[in-house]
Design a protein with these regions (language model features):
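Short loop/turn motifs at secondary-structure junctions and domain boundaries
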Residues: 46-52
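Acyl-donor (CoA/ACP) binding surface of acyl/acetyltransferases
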Residues: 1-27, 53-158
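Conserved GNAT-fold acetyl-CoA-binding loop/helix
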Residues: 24-44
Length: 158
């Protein structure tokens, strides 16, 4: 299976927003945008020259299966950012797609922004996300409870 990263568009943002409303995704991935309009506004901000977030689509054999993005990009003193990802097409999960996509995306954001470290938050019960992050060299830095849910902060250094 060929995994590639594609360009996000207003259409893919709409698709992603719709797919991310599924209860199974909602329990693993908190959503910032509460409406498709808000998601599109956030996307428009990523197109600005001084954007602090950047995303790509995840394609498996040309089929749009998920998204990956960095946010809180800080290229200054100690260049760093955060990363998040989601495979919304359930039939494409557990096939190594997210692992490959994250590996590609880490190289891309290093080249594009010169970051030295990348952080990620995930719920402690999200074993699939933890596996993807750890397979890509992320280490658990902290475990904490927020709103009654155990979460982990992981970090990757180049």
């Amino acid at each position: 299976m060929e995994i590639t990263l594609g360009t996000r568009t207003a259409d893919t943002v709409r698709i992603y927003f719709e797919k991310s409303q599924h209860p199974e995704i909602q329990k693993f991935l908190p959503q910032k945008a509460q409406s498709v309009e808000e998601a599109l506004e956030d996307y428009e901000k990523t197109l600005l020259p001084n954007a602090t977030s950047y995303g790509r689509t995840i394609l498996a054999d040309g089929h749009y299966v998920g998204d990956i993005w960095s946010y809180c990009i800080d290229p200054e003193d100690e260049p760093n950012c955060m990363v998040s990802f989601c495979i919304f097409e359930t039939s494409y999960r557990s096939k190594g797609i997210a692992t490959t996509a994250l590996n590609m995306f880490l190289a891309l954001i290093r080249e594009k922004y010169g970051v030295n470290t990348v952080g990620a938050f995930t719920f402690s019960h999200n074993h699939a996300s933890l596996n993807v992050l750890q397979k890509n060299g992320f280490s658990i830095i902290e475990e904490f409870e927020e709103d009654g849910v155990l979460s982990k902060y992981l970090q990757f250094s180049y």
